């Protein structure tokens, strides 16, 4: 299969029920008559002839080519393909073409081989063997499962599935009460949706106040469901999951789960809409309760999704096993048995740091019902590689102790948020972990193709994608069937390399390059049609909004269900500036967002730089948001023979120490300092007499921190900030939404705050 995101695979098979026979002789006679007796007497008859010939001699589809390719190395698939072709031609299992008698005999032999193979597989796998997604567990799990009892609750499904019948009725008949899971994946896209969804044009139709956030509101593209949100337990959760969550919530001091933020956000997640939550107060800003509420919600949603997926597959496998006398291909002619993707992983959680992944995975384990986590495989290895602590309590994983029992927090001059993020030794950004849920255990470090959930950093997945592009023997096909994507702490990811994240999201739901043991006869049509990206739910969580997040959400999150995003009003942070600094804001004009960078540099070189070039005072710090801007400004200063030093993203510690000293003593008059360098290092710079914000920081808390670095006692302390109308998001977080709107629309282009 070619890794083409827009490719289409078609499943061609009979829509008749498996126990209904066709009048194949009549069908064959009509077809031969039309083809062998062409008429040229009238245009109408010529048209009929052309149409008939088109039906007989049509080009093979990508799906047919796929089956042929897979059949060349897999006899079972080859036999299935032959029978499928025979069905399309209107032939029964016993009827043979006169011209292809030998070939049909070989097909019938293949049918016997297939039945024999299936029987042998059943015996070898055993009753306890799990075969989700066409992938079987390894020998170790076989041994683990042999001693386990069958638990009826493990197979419960919210969409009630009736018993198979043999009187011509459908194998699967969903009840009138269909879960959000079933309703979402069973939807069939219209031709209009297929045409319009890739364009990424969305119109937000409604607004509704956000729960417990008086300054925020939700906006949505589809119908407003918040007022009529499901208010009765278990809120779409599997009962076992809900009961465990409720018990855990009460154990941690919670009184009313039903009206809690975490339950309400779970209901939003369970709507299967794409979600952009841009006002999550993170745990490192003393927002552990709000952060854990959102985390609980998307983790419960993820568990609910993979458990319902597993239950549906196991139910269908059980029903197929009860009807071994009926050929599997005929059973699978019922759409109710199309329950799988190309590969098993269904949930992808992207996180920026290993320490955050540790926190999320520990909570995922806690939220799993105890009967389904009797054993957590490789937990010690996980603690060693991801954590710096022996244990966490069951209340959102907030209790932190080091391996030797001492507190991991150490005295530091760094701010508390930096200590929470980077104070330990588990903050690297290169990791990937497969998590597999079996009936009574959780397997960490599972093979990615046999995992249910993948937790990874954008960097690690970007590296895997690059390796697959260079080496055709490697692949990232485990990303082909992701149905729920969670991007948590997107604000921290934006301080890394956003392009890595964009690349990963772009690679999701592409056609796989290999089969990976998948039963192609049970793949959902949405995958074969190349529409998986239109069904993928994307949940993005951040403490603030950036243009890059807006772009990703609008262009790469194409869920047919629609979108919800948060819009907030800000008060600003100017009051947190403790020094008497005269803060000047200068607006420059840019025709479009693609011209902003050039317009900013031009304004700086013509309006700002001449004022500081010949200054004898020195102590000028230029704060820059992005590394791209940093490089352009550095190159410009080099052409001006300016005395300056650098504190950039990739500066070595020795160079940083030298630059700080040179700036403080005045041997270098100008310092360039990037927001990313400040985010990771938090160096307090001494000797600042004049502050220029070449571009506004994304993180609003950085603004007063940088302002308060100005040398107290300096004569006429002043700062200058450049902005354009395209900087509205950053500007409103700093000066407040009301002031920002006035500054963007005013005829004046200079504003002062004292």
UniProtKB/Swiss-Prot annotation:
InterPro entries: P-loop_NTPase, UTP25, UTP25_C, UTP25_NTPase-like. The keyword Nucleus applies. Disruption phenotype: Abnormal female gametogenesis and altered embryo development with a disturbed cellular division pattern. Increased rRNA expression and hypomethylation of rRNA promoters. Residues 80-93 have a biased composition (Basic and acidic residues). Residues 1-56, 69-166, 390-413 are annotated as: Disordered. GO terms for cellular component: nucleolus; ribonucleoprotein complex. It comes from the Eukaryota. Residues 402-413 have a biased composition (Polar residues). GO terms for biological process: embryo development ending in seed dormancy; embryo sac development; rRNA processing; rRNA transcription. Residues 42-52, 94-110, 138-161 have a biased composition (Acidic residues). It is found in: Nucleus, Nucleolus. GO terms for molecular function: U3 snoRNA binding. Pfam families: Utp25_C, UTP25_NTPase-like. Preferentially expressed in differentiating cells in young tissues such as floral buds, ovules, embryos, secondary roots, pollen, young seedlings and vascular bundles. Observed ubiquitously. Belongs to the UTP25 family. PANTHER family: ORF PROTEIN-RELATED (PTHR12933), U3 SMALL NUCLEOLAR RNA-ASSOCIATED PROTEIN 25 HOMOLOG (PTHR12933:SF0). This is Protein NUCLEOLAR FACTOR 1. The lineage of its organism: Eukaryota, Viridiplantae, Streptophyta, Embryophyta, Tracheophyta.
């Amino acid at each position: 299969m070619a890794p083409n995101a827009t490719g289409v695979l078609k499943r061609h098979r009979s829509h008749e029920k498996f126990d209904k026979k066709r009048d194949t002789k009549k069908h064959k006679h009509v077809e031969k008559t039309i083809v062998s007796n062409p008429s040229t007497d009238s245009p109408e008859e010529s048209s009929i002839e052309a149409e008939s010939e088109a039906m007989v001699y049509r080009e093979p589809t990508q799906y047919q080519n796929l089956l042929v390719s897979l059949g060349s190395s897999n006899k079972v698939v080859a036999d299935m393909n032959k029978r499928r072709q025979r069905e399309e031609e209107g032939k029964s299992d016993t009827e043979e073409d006169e011209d292809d008698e030998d070939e049909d005999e070989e097909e019938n032999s293949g049918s016997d081989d297939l039945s024999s193979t299936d029987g042998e597989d059943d015996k070898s796998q055993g009753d306890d063997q799990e075969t989700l997604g066409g992938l079987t567990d390894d020998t170790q799990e076989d041994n683990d499962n042999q001693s386990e009892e069958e638990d009826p609750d493990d197979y419960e499904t919210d969409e009630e599935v009736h018993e198979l019948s043999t009187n011509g009725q459908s194998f699967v008949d969903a009840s009138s009460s269909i879960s959000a899971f079933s309703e979402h994946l069973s939807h069939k896209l219209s031709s209009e949706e297929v045409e319009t969804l890739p364009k990424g044009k969305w119109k937000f139709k409604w607004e509704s106040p956000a729960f417990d956030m008086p300054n925020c509101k939700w906006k949505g593209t589809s119908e407003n469901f918040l007022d009529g949100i499901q208010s009765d337990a278990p809120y779409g959760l599997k009962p076992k999951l809900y009961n465990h969550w409720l018990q855990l919530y009460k154990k941690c001091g919670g009184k009313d789960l039903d009206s809690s933020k975490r339950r309400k956000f779970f209901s939003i997640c369970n709507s299967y809409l794409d979600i952009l939550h841009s006002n999550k107060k993170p745990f490192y800003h003393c927002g552990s309760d709000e952060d854990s509420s959102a985390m609980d919600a998307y983790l419960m949603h993820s568990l609910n999704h993979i458990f319902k997926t597993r239950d549906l597959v196991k139910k269908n496998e059980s029903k197929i096993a009860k009807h071994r006398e009926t050929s599997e291909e005929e059973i699978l002619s019922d759409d109710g048995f199309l329950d799988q993707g190309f590969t098993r992983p269904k949930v992808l959680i992207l996180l920026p740091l290993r320490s955050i992944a540790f926190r999320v995975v520990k909570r995922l384990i806690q939220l799993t019902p105890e009967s389904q986590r009797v054993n957590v495989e490789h937990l010690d290895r996980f603690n060693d590689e991801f954590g710096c602590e022996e244990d966490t309590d069951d209340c959102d994983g907030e209790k932190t102790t080091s391996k030797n029992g001492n507190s991991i927090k150490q005295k530091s001059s760094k701010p508390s948020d930096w200590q929470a993020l980077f104070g330990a030794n588990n903050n690297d950004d290169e990791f990937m972990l497969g998590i597999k849920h079996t009936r009574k255990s959780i397997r960490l470090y599972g093979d990615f193709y046999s995992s249910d959930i993948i937790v990874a950093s954008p960097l690690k997945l970007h590296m895997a994608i690059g390796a697959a592009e260079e080496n055709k023997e490697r692949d990232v096909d485990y990303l082909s069937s992701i149905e729920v994507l969670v991007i948590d702490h997107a604000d921290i990811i934006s301080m890394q390399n956003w392009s890595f994240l964009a690349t990963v999201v772009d690679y999701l739901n592409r056609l796989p390059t290999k089969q990976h043991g998948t039963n192609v006869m049970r793949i959902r049509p949405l995958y074969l049609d190349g529409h998986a990206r239109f069904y993928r739910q994307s949940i993005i969580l951040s403490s603030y909004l950036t243009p890059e997040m807006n772009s990703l959400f609008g262009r790469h999150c194409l869920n047919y269900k629609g979108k919800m995003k948060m819009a907030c009003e800000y008060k600003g942070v100017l009051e947190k500036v403790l020094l008497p600094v005269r803060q000047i804001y200068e607006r420059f004009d840019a025709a479009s967002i693609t011209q902003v960078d050039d317009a900013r540099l031009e304004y700086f070189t013509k309006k700002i730089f001449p004022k500081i070039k010949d200054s004898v005072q020195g102590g000028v710090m230029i704060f820059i948001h992005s590394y791209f801007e940093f490089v352009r400004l550095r190159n410009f200063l080099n052409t001006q023979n300016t005395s300056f030093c650098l504190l950039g993203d990739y500066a070595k510690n020795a160079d940083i120490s030298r630059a700080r000293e040179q700036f403080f003593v005045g041997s270098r008059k100008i310092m360039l300092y990037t927001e990313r360098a400040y985010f990771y290092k938090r160096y307090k710079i001494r000797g600042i007499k004049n502050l220029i914000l070449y571009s506004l920081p994304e993180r609003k808390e950085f603004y007063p921190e940088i302002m308060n670095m100005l040398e107290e006692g300096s004569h006429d302390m002043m700062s200058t900030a450049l902005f354009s109308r395209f900087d509205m998001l950053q500007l409103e977080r700093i000066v407040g939404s009301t002031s920002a709107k006035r500054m963007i629309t005013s005829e004046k282009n200079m504003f002062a705050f004292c």
